[in-house]
Design a protein with these regions (language model features):
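Redox-cofactor-proximal catalytic regions of oxidoreductases
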Residues: 46-71
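A short acidic, helix-capping loop that chelates divalent metal ions and anchors anionic groups
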Residues: 73-79
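Short, basic/glycine-rich phosphate-binding loops at helix/coil junctions
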Residues: 66-73, 228-233
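Flavin (primarily FAD) cofactor-binding/catalytic cores of flavoenzymes
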Residues: 2-45, 49-50, 79-361
Length: 361
């Protein structure tokens, strides 16, 4: 590659989390060479994807649904060790074992149409002219902050769950946790042990799932998310349709009253929250465990979005530009889904770049 100017490559993989590494693995497996035929660019400072930013008290033993990367199992991990350390070390070993040569930290700033049917990927280390893009940029960089009347007058602290570092930061405080997902429940249960009082509010009643989640249920849940993506709507998270798996820790928290949920408040005041029926809750901190949105603003120059606000996909391929594949997006936004999407994207890109292989595996 010529590092003094625009570098040409066959495939750019943007993002080195679960989805990006899975795609890079499959590119190598079918004969593509890193830094010759493809390049992996990662915004994060070190291996681990979004896992490296998880709060220290989230141990590996409490992680919900971590699936191994293709070609290498994660074995012998200490369940009491922080998940950020366990999975960060696993990803690091994976990158080195398969020689994926991830470039980091590299910001992907924009992707535009270039000459000769190539895409121009503008980054902090220069521009790549590529024949295909696998976008695996995830959601971590786009935490979703809901808007409520009175947010500007609340005198306490407001933070997003992405900035949560542990229950010690809430000792003796009155805390309102907003959100009905896995992070909301995990952080609420931790905070309840040190806070003076906790209040849990959600837009809809949370759905707790008892018992095993079989393959048929999993496929049905993914199909519901995929339906939105095929319609060009912003994707829902998979957990929003699968529900929250009830654990023993959750049962105990529910018995203690920690998981008693209130509907979403109507507005914030200087000292807390208020509802339309006149009830109020005093608070020192509002914690928004309200999820994330896809980090895809760099794709804006390609005009891939549909009127509904999302990018319509056929499998992993963007309908408006078949050179662009989104993985870890919508129905593949789970660790096992990301693995499968990485394989699918590589198969379709290989057929795009080598039409003579269209009937191959």
């Amino acid at each position: 590659m010529n590092y003094s100017g625009v570098r040409e490559t066959e495939v750019v993989v943007a993002g080195a989390g679960q989805a990006g590494l899975a795609a890079a693995f499959h590119l190598r497996r079918v004969g593509y060479e890193p830094d010759r035929d493809f390049v992996v660019l990662d915004h994060a400072p070190r291996p681990g994807g979004a896992w490296q930013f998880r709060w220290p008290t989230l141990t590996y033993g409490t992680v919900h649904g971590m699936h191994a990367l293709p070609g290498m199992e994660l074995t012998g991990a200490d369940p009491d060790r922080p998940s950020s350390e366990v999975i960060g070390a696993y990803f690091d070993t994976y990158e080195r074992t398969f020689g994926l040569r991830v470039h980091r930290p590299v910001d992907v700033r924009a992707v535009r149409a270039g000459a000769d049917e190539r895409l121009l990927v503008e980054t902090s280390e220069g521009t790549y002219a590529t024949r295909a893009l696998i976008n695996a940029t995830g959601t971590w960089d786009r935490p979703f902050w809901p808007r409520f009347p009175g947010q500007e007058v609340f005198r306490g602290r407001q933070l997003h769950s992405s900035a949560y570092r542990g229950p010690q930061d809430f000792a003796g405080q009155r805390v309102i946790v907003v959100g009905g997902g896995t992070s909301a429940v995990q952080q609420l249960m931790e905070i309840a042990g040190t806070a003076a009082a906790t209040t849990w509010v959600t837009r809809r009643p949370p759905l707790f799932r008892e018992g095993p989640f079989d393959e048929q249920q999993g496929r049905a849940a993914v199909a519901r998310v995929e339906e939105r993506v095929r319609a060009g709507l912003p994707p829902q998270s998979v957990v929003s349709v699968t529900g929250l798996p009830m654990t023993e820790a959750m049962r105990q928290a529910r018995a203690r009253g920690v998981l008693e949920r209130l509907p979403l408040f109507d507005r914030l005041t200087e000292t807390g929250a208020t509802w339309s029926d006149g009830s109020t809750v005093e608070a020192d901190t509002i914690l928004y465990a309200t999820g994330f949105r896809a980090a895809i603003d760099h794709l804006a120059p390609l005009k891939l979005r549909e009127p509904g606000g999302g990018i319509r996909l056929d499998g992993t391929r963007a309908v408006r530009d078949p050179r662009v594949h989104l993985i870890g997006y919508g129905p593949s936004a789970s660790t096992i889904g990301a693995n499968r999407a990485g394989r699918t994207a590589v198969r379709e890109i290989r057929q795009l770049l080598r039409p003579d292989l269209r009937t191959a595996a």
